[in-house]
Curated annotation (Swiss-Prot):
EC number annotated for this UniProt entry: 2.4.99.28
Enzyme class (EC, first level): transferase
InterPro entries assigned to the protein according to its UniProt record, in alphabetical order: Glyco_trans_51, Lysozyme-like_dom_sf, PBP_transglycosylase, Pep_trsgly
Domain of life per record: Bacteria
Keywords recorded for this protein, A-Z: Cell inner membrane, Cell membrane, Cell shape, Cell wall biogenesis/degradation, Glycosyltransferase, Membrane, Peptidoglycan synthesis, Transferase, Transmembrane, Transmembrane helix
PANTHER family assigned: BIOSYNTHETIC PEPTIDOGLYCAN TRANSGLYCOSYLASE, MONOFUNCTIONAL BIOSYNTHETIC PEPTIDOGLYCAN TRANSGLYCOSYLASE
Designated name of the protein: Biosynthetic peptidoglycan transglycosylase
Organism: Shewanella oneidensis (strain ATCC 700550 / JCM 31522 / CIP 106686 / LMG 19005 / NCIMB 14063 / MR-1)
Subcellular location: Cell inner membrane
The encoding gene: mtgA
Main localisation: membrane
Membrane among keywords: yes
UniProt catalytic activity: [GlcNAc-(1->4)-Mur2Ac(oyl-L-Ala-gamma-D-Glu-L-Lys-D-Ala-D-Ala)](n)-di-trans,octa-cis-undecaprenyl diphosphate + beta-D-GlcNAc-(1->4)-Mur2Ac(oyl-L-Ala-gamma-D-Glu-L-Lys-D-Ala-D-Ala)-di-trans,octa-cis-undecaprenyl diphosphate = [GlcNAc-(1->4)-Mur2Ac(oyl-L-Ala-gamma-D-Glu-L-Lys-D-Ala-D-Ala)](n+1)-di-trans,octa-cis-undecaprenyl diphosphate + di-trans,octa-cis-undecaprenyl diphosphate + H(+)
Pathway: Cell wall biogenesis; peptidoglycan biosynthesis
C-alpha cells in the first residue's frame, strides 16, 4: 500500500508541477518571443521530406502587413476577434460531419492553432486535444488577441522550412512582410491548410481559387475586424 501511495503522491506532484509550469510558460511568452516551438522541433526531427534550409525571422504585429493579418483571419478563423478560444459552431459541425464519415476543415481557431504549434505534438489523440484546449484557455486568459495573432503569424509554417510571415514574404515575393499586397497575402493564407502540398509560387489552381475566396471574405470583414482584434483583451 505504501508503494501505491508513493506512486500516487509522485504523480500528484508531477501533475501539479506541470500545471504551474504551463501557466508560467504562457505568462513568460506574453512578453518574450519564443526562440523555438514544438511544431518546428517535430518538423526538424521528422520532416515529411528533406529540408535544405530553415528560414525564420520574428516580426512584431506592426511589422506585418494588415493585409496578411486580415487574410489569415478570413481564411482560418473569422470569429477570432469575438470568441474565447473556441468556435463551438465549427466544433459541432466537425463532429456532425465526422459522424457521417466526412471531414471538415476549420474547427480549430487561430488560438488553438497557435497553442498547437507552440506546445503540442501532431498526434490526434484526445489527450493531446485536451492539453491543447488547456493551453488555448491559458493564452486567451493571459494574452490579448493581438499577441495571439502576432505569435501565430510568426510561427506558422508557410512551406517546407519556412516559418512565419517575414520568411514567407521574402522567400515567395522578395519583400518584407510589411509590404505584402492583398493578393500576395491571400496566396499565403490559401496555402495554410497544407503548405507542403499547396504551392504559393507558382500558385496552383486550387490556391488561386481559394485566394480569390479569401479576398472576397476580406472585403466583407473589412478593417473593422482588425480594429476589434486590437481592442480585444
Amino acid at each position: 500500500m505504501r508503494g501505491v501511495k508513493r506512486v500516487f503522491t509522485w504523480l500528484a506532484k508531477l501533475v501539479l508541477g506541470l500545471f504551474f509550469a504551463s501557466i508560467l510558460s504562457v505568462v513568460l511568452l506574453r512578453f518574450i518571443d519564443p526562440p523555438m516551438w514544438s511544431w518546428r522541433i517535430e518538423r526538424a526531427l521528422f520532416p515529411p521530406a528533406p529540408i535544405t534550409e530553415v528560414r525564420h525571422q520574428w516580426r512584431s504585429l506592426e511589422q506585418i502587413s494588415p493585409e496578411l493579418q486580415l487574410a489569415v483571419i478570413a481564411a482560418e478563423d473569422q470569429k477570432f476577434a469575438g470568441h474565447s478560444g473556441f468556435d463551438l459552431d465549427a466544433i459541432s459541425s466537425a463532429i456532425e460531419y465526422n459522424q457521417k464519415g466526412k471531414k471538415v476543415r476549420g474547427a480549430s481557431t487561430l488560438s488553438q492553432q497557435a497553442a498547437k504549434n507552440l506546445f503540442m505534438w501532431s498526434s490526434r489523440s484526445f489527450i493531446r486535444k485536451g492539453i491543447e484546449a488547456w493551453f488555448t484557455l491559458l493564452m486567451e486568459l493571459i494574452w490579448d488577441k493581438a499577441r495571439i495573432l502576432e505569435v501565430y503569424l510568426n510561427i506558422v509554417e508557410f512551406g517546407p522550412g519556412i516559418y512565419g510571415a517575414e520568411a514567407a514574404s521574402k522567400h515567395y515575393f522578395g519583400k518584407s512582410a510589411a509590404k505584402l499586397t492583398r493578393y500576395e497575402a491571400s496566396l499565403l493564407a490559401a496555402a495554410l491548410p497544407n503548405p507542403w502540398r499547396y504551392k504559393v509560387s507558382p500558385p496552383s489552381s486550387y490556391v488561386e481559387q481559394r485566394s480569390a475566396w479569401i479576398r472576397k471574405q476580406m472585403r466583407q470583414l473589412g478593417e473593422v475586424t482588425l480594429k476589434k482584434v486590437n481592442e480585444a483583451q
